[in-house]
């Protein structure tokens, strides 16, 4: 699900070089740019022209499988199998060793949430290039690309498996040492790769640093985390500290939630602040699972990397447009600005300049929109889970009230990866829509003022606003006439509206007849507005996987929303605080009933042993050896 990939900068370089037929310089090669770029672009490329790093991140990814498999084998050997097979099975020779290692509990894990999230964040730049299909370890036909990406995902997933396995292992001392060593290897290799070639061909100075600093930060956190685990485990091993408690079946926040349900609701609710009412209210009786924390952390870092990659593409395209613009200026100068194509060329130059400016300006609002979506998705997850805990399913479409069990299990495996992909594609689509909107505003409002056509623009804008106002006013007048003349009075003074009972029927029929022809024309505008609003809302909410953008009755066609609902049902069935508390009571009662006879019979056996030993001692002391027969 959380797949990984290879070197960020190298992947961008390879993909961008496919966009042009001109010979360009690769990292560590002797080819140069032959196109005439701006001085800034040439300086940026010259920074990395002679860089030939000794670290090949793709090759290191392949070789990292060796220590990864060794760590997995060690942890698997330490992991005990709960159920051993029969003697006629060959696995019996292994004893109870080599159990299955679980990297992360994707359903009910609430501890080490941020450690798992940071571990996923350390793989963000790798995830990005599987998302962009920048990593293909094998060259196969086009129809087999899906299998190649699957193999690549398994390979890079296996290379980062020790991060999660060492965090979740029960053998804290061994796993912390192995995890620290493996994280240190990745950290040193990444730092070596950055220091050898810190600059790049697209962003110039410190381009490689911009790609790798999130992974370095996450690896640094993991180093500190594994070191802290090793120190704590060593103190316990030496007897300097108490043994850590076993992971509880019932989490504290789940128990607090059940206690809150059993309490009487307060007579008067506490007054909430503006932040709690409008933004977010913290709930001590609810915790997000590790899967949600890891998804959000990875989505944040992937969104940042996606924006950086997009900016690299923008720099590349902008330099190509600058070259094209220079050729257009040369043509205009050659014809002394009197040629038949001169006005068209000036308009094309203006279009290119406006497009570059609008695209650059809309990066920030598009990014902020997607960031707000990530926070909103967390809030919706908590809200939807609480509704399901209360037995309320009315917020879901009717077709999703009873999803299939197999579909829900698959959904929880799909959700995290799909959420990240939806955020990235949503950012790009929102950015395109905002850029088009910016182009419309620029051509409709800004350029007329620049070209001394402000009065004509205001005249046309005023006529348009007046036309729309009249149309909306006539629609409001129709509603007011219907309320005043064609409905019977309220039955009670406390009624909010009049009853749906017709009055003045003859006038009502004439009203409908004469407005019939007008409403045909009005319906054309309403239809176009419906299409426009649907397109805007659909593109604006494309990144929101927590709500469907399909019409009622077609919700099943939204696969992302189906994954969201299936994930909610799995979490609802496995982490419902009331259900978990009930199971906790059953398990505790069973343990108590199991231990009680053992304690009772053990006490009786101990008493019987003491009595018999006492009797034997008394018999030996009272009996005279000489009187024995």
Model-inferred region functions:
Residues 2-523, 528-629:
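Solvent-exposed, extramembrane regions of membrane proteins
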